[in-house]
Protein backbone atom coordinates (compact mmCIF):
# COMPACT_ATOMS: atom_id res chain seq x y z
CA UNK A 1 0.00 0.00 0.00
CA UNK A 2 1.22 3.48 -0.87
CA UNK A 3 0.38 6.61 1.14
CA UNK A 4 0.21 10.34 0.50
CA UNK A 5 0.31 13.26 2.92
CA UNK A 6 -1.95 16.30 2.79
CA UNK A 7 -1.01 19.35 4.85
CA UNK A 8 -3.65 22.05 5.30
CA UNK A 9 -2.08 25.29 6.53
CA UNK A 10 -5.03 27.33 7.78
CA UNK A 11 -5.47 30.60 9.64
CA UNK A 12 -6.22 29.03 13.01
CA UNK A 13 -4.00 25.97 12.71
CA UNK A 14 -2.27 23.40 10.53
CA UNK A 15 -3.80 19.97 10.01
CA UNK A 16 -1.90 17.10 8.47
CA UNK A 17 -3.72 14.01 7.23
CA UNK A 18 -2.20 10.74 6.03
CA UNK A 19 -4.23 9.03 3.29
CA UNK A 20 -3.84 5.69 1.61
CA UNK A 21 -3.79 5.64 -2.19
CA UNK A 22 -7.57 5.09 -2.30
CA UNK A 23 -8.40 8.25 -0.34
CA UNK A 24 -9.05 6.74 3.08
CA UNK A 25 -7.85 8.94 5.94
CA UNK A 26 -5.51 6.86 8.09
CA UNK A 27 -4.48 9.39 10.70
CA UNK A 28 -4.53 13.14 11.33
CA UNK A 29 -3.04 15.73 13.67
CA UNK A 30 -3.74 19.41 14.33
CA UNK A 31 -1.63 22.18 15.86
CA UNK A 32 -3.12 25.63 16.43
CA UNK A 33 -1.36 29.00 16.51
CA UNK A 34 -2.36 32.62 17.15
CA UNK A 35 -3.34 35.49 14.88
CA UNK A 36 -2.01 38.91 15.87
CA UNK A 37 -3.94 42.16 15.33
CA UNK A 38 -1.64 45.02 16.41
CA UNK A 39 -4.07 47.60 14.99
CA UNK A 40 -7.72 47.64 13.90
CA UNK A 41 -7.96 45.95 10.50
CA UNK A 42 -4.46 44.47 10.66
CA UNK A 43 -3.79 40.72 10.74
CA UNK A 44 -0.41 39.02 11.04
CA UNK A 45 1.05 35.62 11.85
CA UNK A 46 4.53 34.24 12.45
CA UNK A 47 5.73 32.01 9.57
CA UNK A 48 7.80 30.03 12.05
CA UNK A 49 4.55 28.95 13.72
CA UNK A 50 3.36 27.42 10.44
CA UNK A 51 6.59 25.52 9.94
CA UNK A 52 6.73 24.15 13.48
CA UNK A 53 3.07 23.11 13.20
CA UNK A 54 3.80 21.28 9.95
CA UNK A 55 6.78 19.44 11.43
CA UNK A 56 4.90 18.50 14.59
CA UNK A 57 1.81 17.23 12.75
CA UNK A 58 3.79 15.25 10.19
CA UNK A 59 5.79 13.56 12.93
CA UNK A 60 2.59 12.90 14.88
CA UNK A 61 0.70 11.17 12.05
CA UNK A 62 3.68 9.03 11.11
CA UNK A 63 4.17 7.97 14.72
CA UNK A 64 0.48 7.26 15.40
CA UNK A 65 -0.12 5.43 12.12
CA UNK A 66 2.94 3.19 12.25
CA UNK A 67 3.24 3.48 8.46
CA UNK A 68 6.71 2.84 7.04
CA UNK A 69 8.16 6.17 5.91
CA UNK A 70 9.28 4.59 2.62
CA UNK A 71 5.62 3.97 1.75
CA UNK A 72 4.77 7.69 2.01
CA UNK A 73 5.55 8.46 -1.61
CA UNK A 74 4.53 12.10 -1.84
CA UNK A 75 2.97 15.08 -0.11
CA UNK A 76 1.15 18.28 -0.98
CA UNK A 77 0.52 21.47 0.97
CA UNK A 78 -2.66 23.53 0.96
CA UNK A 79 -2.33 27.05 2.28
CA UNK A 80 -4.25 30.12 3.33
CA UNK A 81 -3.84 32.41 0.33
CA UNK A 82 -2.33 35.89 -0.18
CA UNK A 83 -0.10 36.06 2.89
CA UNK A 84 3.22 37.88 2.39
CA UNK A 85 6.36 36.13 3.65
CA UNK A 86 9.60 38.07 3.16
CA UNK A 87 12.99 36.40 3.51
CA UNK A 88 16.51 37.82 3.51
CA UNK A 89 19.48 36.45 1.59
CA UNK A 90 20.04 33.74 4.20
CA UNK A 91 16.40 32.64 4.10
CA UNK A 92 15.48 34.22 7.42
CA UNK A 93 12.04 35.74 7.99
CA UNK A 94 12.26 39.54 7.95
CA UNK A 95 8.91 40.40 9.57
CA UNK A 96 5.63 38.74 10.60
CA UNK A 97 3.52 37.71 7.63
CA UNK A 98 0.75 40.11 6.66
CA UNK A 99 -2.03 37.60 5.98
CA UNK A 100 -5.09 37.41 3.74
CA UNK A 101 -7.62 39.22 5.96
CA UNK A 102 -5.41 42.25 6.67
CA UNK A 103 -7.02 45.49 5.49
CA UNK A 104 -4.25 48.11 5.87
CA UNK A 105 -3.39 48.52 2.18
CA UNK A 106 -6.21 50.64 0.72
CA UNK A 107 -3.75 53.39 -0.29
CA UNK A 108 -1.51 50.86 -2.03
CA UNK A 109 -4.49 49.51 -3.97
CA UNK A 110 -5.18 53.04 -5.19
CA UNK A 111 -1.51 53.34 -6.11
CA UNK A 112 -1.66 50.14 -8.18
CA UNK A 113 -4.74 51.33 -10.05
CA UNK A 114 -3.13 54.72 -10.72
CA UNK A 115 0.06 53.20 -12.14
CA UNK A 116 -1.33 50.18 -13.98
CA UNK A 117 -4.94 51.17 -14.63
CA UNK A 118 -7.82 49.17 -13.22
CA UNK A 119 -8.93 47.69 -16.54
CA UNK A 120 -5.42 46.68 -17.56
CA UNK A 121 -4.81 45.15 -14.14
CA UNK A 122 -7.95 43.03 -14.48
CA UNK A 123 -6.93 41.97 -18.00
CA UNK A 124 -3.58 40.69 -16.67
CA UNK A 125 -4.39 39.37 -13.19
CA UNK A 126 -8.17 38.78 -13.67
CA UNK A 127 -8.85 40.85 -10.54
CA UNK A 128 -8.80 44.48 -9.39
CA UNK A 129 -6.34 45.59 -6.72
CA UNK A 130 -7.57 44.35 -3.35
CA UNK A 131 -6.33 44.85 0.18
CA UNK A 132 -6.28 41.10 0.76
CA UNK A 133 -3.92 40.31 -2.11
CA UNK A 134 -0.15 39.97 -1.78
CA UNK A 135 0.88 42.74 -4.17
CA UNK A 136 -0.63 45.57 -2.14
CA UNK A 137 0.97 44.14 1.02
CA UNK A 138 4.37 44.13 -0.68
CA UNK A 139 3.96 47.77 -1.70
CA UNK A 140 2.86 48.65 1.84
CA UNK A 141 6.12 47.26 3.20
CA UNK A 142 8.07 49.15 0.54
CA UNK A 143 6.24 52.37 1.46
CA UNK A 144 6.24 52.02 5.25
CA UNK A 145 9.16 49.71 6.08
CA UNK A 146 11.79 50.48 3.42
CA UNK A 147 14.57 49.03 5.55
CA UNK A 148 12.78 45.65 5.54
CA UNK A 149 12.06 45.80 1.82
CA UNK A 150 15.72 46.58 1.07
CA UNK A 151 16.80 43.35 2.79
CA UNK A 152 14.20 41.18 1.02
CA UNK A 153 15.50 38.59 -1.44
CA UNK A 154 12.59 36.15 -1.58
CA UNK A 155 8.80 36.57 -1.48
CA UNK A 156 6.78 33.49 -0.64
CA UNK A 157 3.21 32.56 0.20
CA UNK A 158 2.44 30.80 3.51
CA UNK A 159 2.43 27.24 2.19
CA UNK A 160 5.47 27.94 0.02
CA UNK A 161 7.45 29.07 3.06
CA UNK A 162 6.71 25.70 4.66
CA UNK A 163 7.74 24.01 1.39
CA UNK A 164 11.02 25.94 1.45
CA UNK A 165 11.70 24.89 5.03
CA UNK A 166 10.95 21.23 4.23
CA UNK A 167 12.75 21.02 0.88
CA UNK A 168 15.06 24.00 0.46
CA UNK A 169 13.26 24.88 -2.79
CA UNK A 170 11.81 28.28 -3.65
CA UNK A 171 8.67 27.28 -5.55
CA UNK A 172 5.00 28.09 -5.90
CA UNK A 173 2.15 26.94 -8.14
CA UNK A 174 -0.48 28.58 -10.32
CA UNK A 175 -3.55 28.48 -8.07
CA UNK A 176 -1.95 30.18 -5.06
CA UNK A 177 0.24 32.46 -7.18
CA UNK A 178 -2.94 33.78 -8.85
CA UNK A 179 -3.81 35.43 -5.53
CA UNK A 180 -0.53 37.33 -5.36
CA UNK A 181 -1.74 39.67 -8.14
CA UNK A 182 1.57 39.45 -9.96
CA UNK A 183 0.64 36.46 -12.12
CA UNK A 184 -0.58 36.69 -15.71
CA UNK A 185 -3.62 34.52 -14.98
CA UNK A 186 -4.66 33.85 -18.61
CA UNK A 187 -1.11 32.66 -19.44
CA UNK A 188 -0.23 31.10 -16.06
CA UNK A 189 3.14 32.86 -15.60
CA UNK A 190 4.56 35.93 -13.85
CA UNK A 191 3.66 39.17 -15.62
CA UNK A 192 6.90 40.89 -16.63
CA UNK A 193 4.89 43.89 -17.80
CA UNK A 194 3.18 44.37 -14.44
CA UNK A 195 6.37 43.84 -12.45
CA UNK A 196 8.21 46.39 -14.59
CA UNK A 197 5.43 48.96 -14.20
CA UNK A 198 5.58 48.62 -10.41
CA UNK A 199 9.38 48.35 -10.24
CA UNK A 200 9.39 44.92 -8.60
CA UNK A 201 12.43 42.71 -9.15
CA UNK A 202 11.25 39.41 -10.74
CA UNK A 203 14.07 37.55 -8.97
CA UNK A 204 12.14 37.97 -5.70
CA UNK A 205 9.50 35.55 -6.97
CA UNK A 206 9.66 31.76 -6.93
CA UNK A 207 9.42 29.44 -9.92
CA UNK A 208 5.79 28.69 -10.87
CA UNK A 209 4.60 25.10 -11.31
CA UNK A 210 1.28 23.45 -12.09
CA UNK A 211 -0.35 22.20 -8.90
CA UNK A 212 0.28 18.49 -9.49
CA UNK A 213 3.87 18.90 -10.68
CA UNK A 214 6.74 17.74 -8.48
CA UNK A 215 8.71 20.70 -7.09
CA UNK A 216 11.26 18.76 -5.05
CA UNK A 217 11.68 16.27 -2.24
CA UNK A 218 12.14 16.28 1.52
CA UNK A 219 15.56 17.53 2.61
CA UNK A 220 17.83 15.55 4.91
CA UNK A 221 17.29 18.00 7.77
CA UNK A 222 13.50 17.93 7.37
CA UNK A 223 13.51 14.13 7.12
CA UNK A 224 15.23 13.92 10.50
CA UNK A 225 12.74 16.33 12.08
CA UNK A 226 9.57 14.83 10.60
CA UNK A 227 10.37 11.15 10.24
CA UNK A 228 9.73 11.25 6.49
CA UNK A 229 12.01 9.71 3.90
CA UNK A 230 14.23 11.94 1.78
CA UNK A 231 12.63 10.18 -1.19
CA UNK A 232 9.19 11.62 -0.38
CA UNK A 233 8.21 13.88 -3.28
CA UNK A 234 6.61 17.29 -2.78
CA UNK A 235 4.18 18.60 -5.40
CA UNK A 236 3.05 22.15 -6.09
CA UNK A 237 -0.01 21.86 -3.89
CA UNK A 238 -2.69 24.55 -4.01
CA UNK A 239 -4.24 27.56 -2.38
CA UNK A 240 -6.81 26.50 0.20
CA UNK A 241 -9.84 26.98 -2.03
CA UNK A 242 -8.31 25.34 -5.08
CA UNK A 243 -7.29 22.44 -2.83
CA UNK A 244 -10.82 22.20 -1.44
CA UNK A 245 -12.12 22.04 -5.01
CA UNK A 246 -9.97 19.02 -5.76
CA UNK A 247 -10.84 17.49 -2.39
CA UNK A 248 -14.56 17.74 -3.14
CA UNK A 249 -14.30 16.68 -6.78
CA UNK A 250 -15.07 20.13 -8.21
CA UNK A 251 -12.72 19.63 -11.14
CA UNK A 252 -15.15 19.74 -14.09
CA UNK A 253 -17.67 22.23 -15.48
CA UNK A 254 -21.04 22.47 -13.70
CA UNK A 255 -19.59 21.65 -10.30
CA UNK A 256 -19.25 24.04 -7.35
CA UNK A 257 -18.69 24.09 -3.63
CA UNK A 258 -19.28 26.42 -0.71
CA UNK A 259 -16.74 26.66 2.08
CA UNK A 260 -17.52 27.99 5.53
CA UNK A 261 -14.06 28.19 7.03
CA UNK A 262 -12.54 31.29 8.59
CA UNK A 263 -13.56 32.98 5.36
CA UNK A 264 -16.47 31.91 3.18
CA UNK A 265 -16.22 30.92 -0.47
CA UNK A 266 -18.54 30.04 -3.33
CA UNK A 267 -16.32 28.37 -5.92
CA UNK A 268 -17.10 27.10 -9.43
CA UNK A 269 -14.87 25.30 -11.93
CA UNK A 270 -14.63 26.49 -15.53
CA UNK A 271 -12.70 25.08 -18.48
CA UNK A 272 -12.90 28.49 -20.18
CA UNK A 273 -11.41 31.69 -18.79
CA UNK A 274 -14.18 33.88 -17.31
CA UNK A 275 -13.43 37.30 -15.81
CA UNK A 276 -15.87 39.67 -14.11
CA UNK A 277 -15.10 43.16 -15.50
CA UNK A 278 -16.45 44.67 -12.26
CA UNK A 279 -13.95 42.67 -10.23
CA UNK A 280 -16.53 41.44 -7.71
CA UNK A 281 -15.44 37.81 -7.86
CA UNK A 282 -12.00 36.33 -8.30
CA UNK A 283 -10.79 34.35 -11.28
CA UNK A 284 -7.73 32.24 -10.54
CA UNK A 285 -5.86 29.42 -12.21
CA UNK A 286 -7.29 26.09 -11.13
CA UNK A 287 -5.32 23.21 -9.64
CA UNK A 288 -6.36 21.26 -12.75
CA UNK A 289 -3.86 22.07 -15.52
CA UNK A 290 -5.37 24.24 -18.26
CA UNK A 291 -8.46 25.24 -16.27
CA UNK A 292 -9.58 28.12 -14.07
CA UNK A 293 -12.02 28.75 -11.26
CA UNK A 294 -14.28 31.62 -10.34
CA UNK A 295 -14.96 32.34 -6.70
CA UNK A 296 -16.73 34.84 -4.54
CA UNK A 297 -15.27 35.40 -1.09
CA UNK A 298 -16.77 36.70 2.14
CA UNK A 299 -14.14 37.70 4.68
CA UNK A 300 -15.64 36.54 7.98
CA UNK A 301 -17.77 33.40 7.63
CA UNK A 302 -16.64 30.90 10.25
CA UNK A 303 -14.70 33.76 11.79
CA UNK A 304 -18.03 35.38 12.70
CA UNK A 305 -19.18 32.32 14.63
CA UNK A 306 -15.74 31.88 16.23
CA UNK A 307 -15.80 35.54 17.31
CA UNK A 308 -19.24 35.02 18.85
CA UNK A 309 -18.12 31.79 20.54
CA UNK A 310 -15.02 33.36 22.07
CA UNK A 311 -16.81 36.47 23.35
CA UNK A 312 -20.34 35.36 24.25
CA UNK A 313 -20.37 31.57 24.65
CA UNK A 314 -18.10 30.86 27.59
CA UNK A 315 -20.81 28.72 29.20
CA UNK A 316 -21.04 26.55 26.09
CA UNK A 317 -17.26 26.22 25.92
CA UNK A 318 -17.10 25.13 29.57
CA UNK A 319 -20.02 22.71 29.21
CA UNK A 320 -18.55 21.25 26.03
CA UNK A 321 -15.21 20.70 27.74
CA UNK A 322 -16.91 18.78 30.57
CA UNK A 323 -18.96 16.71 28.11
CA UNK A 324 -16.07 16.09 25.74
CA UNK A 325 -18.10 17.71 22.96
CA UNK A 326 -17.42 20.42 20.39
CA UNK A 327 -18.86 23.75 21.65
CA UNK A 328 -20.11 24.45 18.14
CA UNK A 329 -22.50 21.51 18.47
CA UNK A 330 -24.09 23.14 21.53
CA UNK A 331 -24.23 26.47 19.72
CA UNK A 332 -25.94 24.83 16.73
CA UNK A 333 -28.58 23.33 19.01
CA UNK A 334 -29.32 26.77 20.44
CA UNK A 335 -29.50 28.40 17.01
CA UNK A 336 -31.95 25.72 15.85
CA UNK A 337 -34.38 26.85 18.57
CA UNK A 338 -34.68 30.30 16.97
CA UNK A 339 -37.02 30.62 13.95
CA UNK A 340 -36.05 31.60 10.42
CA UNK A 341 -35.23 35.29 10.53
CA UNK A 342 -34.03 35.00 14.16
CA UNK A 343 -37.10 36.89 15.40
CA UNK A 344 -36.46 39.80 13.03
CA UNK A 345 -32.74 40.07 13.76
CA UNK A 346 -30.16 40.39 10.98
CA UNK A 347 -26.37 40.13 11.08
CA UNK A 348 -23.95 41.61 8.53
CA UNK A 349 -20.68 39.60 8.66
CA UNK A 350 -18.26 42.40 7.81
CA UNK A 351 -15.85 41.93 10.73
CA UNK A 352 -12.82 42.26 8.45
CA UNK A 353 -14.26 44.44 5.68
CA UNK A 354 -15.69 42.59 2.68
CA UNK A 355 -14.64 41.28 -0.70
CA UNK A 356 -17.57 39.90 -2.71
CA UNK A 357 -19.63 41.74 -3.79
CA UNK A 358 -18.76 45.06 -2.13
CA UNK A 359 -14.94 45.29 -2.32
CA UNK A 360 -15.01 47.56 0.72
CA UNK A 361 -12.25 47.45 3.33
CA UNK A 362 -14.07 49.96 5.55
CA UNK A 363 -17.42 48.20 6.04
CA UNK A 364 -17.92 46.58 9.43
CA UNK A 365 -20.20 44.01 11.00
CA UNK A 366 -23.47 44.75 12.72
CA UNK A 367 -26.60 43.30 14.29
CA UNK A 368 -29.66 45.03 12.83
CA UNK A 369 -32.97 44.97 14.70
CA UNK A 370 -31.64 44.05 18.13
CA UNK A 371 -34.25 44.38 20.88
CA UNK A 372 -34.80 43.38 24.51
CA UNK A 373 -36.71 40.28 23.42
CA UNK A 374 -33.72 38.71 21.70
CA UNK A 375 -31.76 35.91 23.32
CA UNK A 376 -28.38 34.40 22.65
CA UNK A 377 -30.01 31.74 20.48
CA UNK A 378 -31.41 34.50 18.23
CA UNK A 379 -28.00 36.12 17.91
CA UNK A 380 -26.44 32.76 17.07
CA UNK A 381 -28.98 32.07 14.36
CA UNK A 382 -28.64 35.60 13.00
CA UNK A 383 -24.89 35.10 12.66
CA UNK A 384 -25.34 31.84 10.76
CA UNK A 385 -28.04 33.31 8.53
CA UNK A 386 -26.03 36.47 7.85
CA UNK A 387 -23.06 34.42 6.69
CA UNK A 388 -25.38 32.37 4.48
CA UNK A 389 -26.80 35.53 2.90
CA UNK A 390 -23.29 36.82 2.20
CA UNK A 391 -22.59 33.54 0.38
CA UNK A 392 -25.83 34.00 -1.58
CA UNK A 393 -24.43 37.36 -2.70
CA UNK A 394 -21.45 35.49 -4.13
CA UNK A 395 -23.64 32.94 -5.92
CA UNK A 396 -25.69 35.72 -7.50
CA UNK A 397 -22.59 37.31 -9.04
CA UNK A 398 -21.54 33.97 -10.55
CA UNK A 399 -25.01 33.67 -12.07
CA UNK A 400 -24.60 37.11 -13.67
CA UNK A 401 -21.42 35.81 -15.33
CA UNK A 402 -23.25 32.83 -16.77
CA UNK A 403 -21.68 30.40 -14.31
CA UNK A 404 -24.62 28.33 -13.07
CA UNK A 405 -23.61 25.37 -10.88
CA UNK A 406 -25.65 22.20 -11.18
CA UNK A 407 -24.27 20.61 -8.02
CA UNK A 408 -23.20 22.21 -4.72
CA UNK A 409 -20.99 20.66 -2.08
CA UNK A 410 -20.37 22.10 1.39
CA UNK A 411 -17.03 21.96 3.16
CA UNK A 412 -15.07 23.69 5.89
CA UNK A 413 -15.94 23.64 9.58
CA UNK A 414 -19.34 25.24 8.98
CA UNK A 415 -20.13 22.67 6.31
CA UNK A 416 -20.17 19.99 9.00
CA UNK A 417 -23.26 21.57 10.57
CA UNK A 418 -26.55 20.03 9.32
CA UNK A 419 -28.33 23.25 10.33
CA UNK A 420 -25.97 25.43 8.31
CA UNK A 421 -26.17 23.08 5.30
CA UNK A 422 -29.97 23.28 5.41
CA UNK A 423 -29.74 27.08 5.47
CA UNK A 424 -27.52 26.91 2.39
CA UNK A 425 -29.94 24.58 0.59
CA UNK A 426 -32.93 26.79 1.42
CA UNK A 427 -31.22 30.09 0.54
CA UNK A 428 -29.38 28.79 -2.55
CA UNK A 429 -32.50 26.84 -3.57
CA UNK A 430 -30.49 23.79 -4.61
CA UNK A 431 -29.41 20.49 -3.05
CA UNK A 432 -26.32 20.71 -0.86
CA UNK A 433 -24.21 17.63 -0.19
CA UNK A 434 -20.97 16.77 1.59
CA UNK A 435 -18.21 14.36 0.76
CA UNK A 436 -17.74 11.21 2.83
CA UNK A 437 -14.23 12.38 3.61
CA UNK A 438 -14.48 15.87 5.11
CA UNK A 439 -10.78 16.68 4.86
CA UNK A 440 -11.37 18.82 1.75
CA UNK A 441 -8.14 20.84 1.32
CA UNK A 442 -5.91 18.16 2.86
CA UNK A 443 -7.46 15.48 0.64
CA UNK A 444 -7.20 17.81 -2.34
CA UNK A 445 -3.45 18.26 -2.07
CA UNK A 446 -3.05 14.57 -1.23
CA UNK A 447 -4.80 13.82 -4.54
CA UNK A 448 -2.43 16.21 -6.30
CA UNK A 449 0.45 14.42 -4.58
CA UNK A 450 -0.87 11.09 -5.84
CA UNK A 451 -0.98 12.40 -9.40
CA UNK A 452 2.54 13.81 -9.06
CA UNK A 453 3.82 10.46 -7.83
CA UNK A 454 2.21 8.63 -10.74
CA UNK A 455 -0.46 6.81 -8.72
CA UNK A 456 -3.07 8.36 -11.03
CA UNK A 457 -2.84 9.74 -14.56
CA UNK A 458 -4.86 12.92 -14.02
CA UNK A 459 -6.61 14.97 -11.35
CA UNK A 460 -10.17 14.05 -12.52
CA UNK A 461 -9.22 10.36 -12.60
CA UNK A 462 -7.82 10.57 -9.07
CA UNK A 463 -10.95 12.36 -7.83
CA UNK A 464 -13.23 9.68 -9.25
CA UNK A 465 -11.23 7.03 -7.41
CA UNK A 466 -10.72 8.80 -4.09
CA UNK A 467 -13.86 10.93 -3.46
CA UNK A 468 -17.34 9.75 -2.43
CA UNK A 469 -20.41 11.95 -1.81
CA UNK A 470 -23.08 11.67 0.91
CA UNK A 471 -26.82 12.08 0.17
CA UNK A 472 -27.75 15.75 -0.34
CA UNK A 473 -29.96 17.96 1.83
CA UNK A 474 -32.71 19.37 -0.37
CA UNK A 475 -34.42 22.76 0.03
CA UNK A 476 -37.45 22.68 2.33
CA UNK A 477 -40.18 24.20 0.18
CA UNK A 478 -41.92 26.16 2.94
CA UNK A 479 -38.62 27.64 4.16
CA UNK A 480 -37.63 29.20 0.84
CA UNK A 481 -40.06 32.17 0.76
CA UNK A 482 -39.31 32.98 4.41
CA UNK A 483 -35.60 33.26 3.69
CA UNK A 484 -36.28 35.25 0.52
CA UNK A 485 -38.03 37.96 2.53
CA UNK A 486 -35.20 38.25 5.04
CA UNK A 487 -32.54 38.16 2.32
CA UNK A 488 -34.27 40.98 0.46
CA UNK A 489 -33.87 43.16 3.57
CA UNK A 490 -30.29 41.96 4.12
CA UNK A 491 -29.26 43.15 0.66
CA UNK A 492 -30.29 46.70 1.62
CA UNK A 493 -28.15 46.87 4.77
CA UNK A 494 -24.84 47.54 3.05
CA UNK A 495 -26.10 50.29 0.75
CA UNK A 496 -27.96 51.98 3.61
CA UNK A 497 -24.78 52.10 5.71
CA UNK A 498 -22.05 52.48 3.08
CA UNK A 499 -21.51 56.17 3.81
CA UNK A 500 -21.57 55.60 7.56
CA UNK A 501 -18.84 52.95 7.24
CA UNK A 502 -16.59 55.57 5.62
CA UNK A 503 -17.32 58.04 8.41
CA UNK A 504 -16.61 55.39 11.05
CA UNK A 505 -13.26 54.58 9.45
CA UNK A 506 -12.21 58.22 9.79
CA UNK A 507 -12.89 58.45 13.53
Task: Give a label for each model feature.
Residues 5-6, 21, 106, 113-130, ...:
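Active-site core segments that coordinate phosphate-bearing ligands/cofactors
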Residues 43-51, 98, 321-324, 384:
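Flexible, glycine- and charge-enriched loops at secondary-structure boundaries
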Amino acid sequence: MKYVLGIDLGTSGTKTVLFDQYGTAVCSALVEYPLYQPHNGWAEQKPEDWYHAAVDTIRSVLTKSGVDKKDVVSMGISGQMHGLVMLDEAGNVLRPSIIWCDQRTAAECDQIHEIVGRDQLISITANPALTGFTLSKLLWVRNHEPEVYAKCRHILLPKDYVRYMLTGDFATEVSDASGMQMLDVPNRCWSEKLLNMLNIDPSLLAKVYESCEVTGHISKAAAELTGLSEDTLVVGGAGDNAAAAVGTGVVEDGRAFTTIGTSGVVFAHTDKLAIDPKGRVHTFCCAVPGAWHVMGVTQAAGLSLKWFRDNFCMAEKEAAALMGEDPYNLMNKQAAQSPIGANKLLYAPYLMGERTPHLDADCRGMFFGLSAMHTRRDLLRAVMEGVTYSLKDCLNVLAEMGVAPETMLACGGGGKSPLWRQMLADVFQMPVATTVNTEGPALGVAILAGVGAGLYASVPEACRAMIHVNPAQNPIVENVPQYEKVYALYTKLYQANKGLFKELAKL
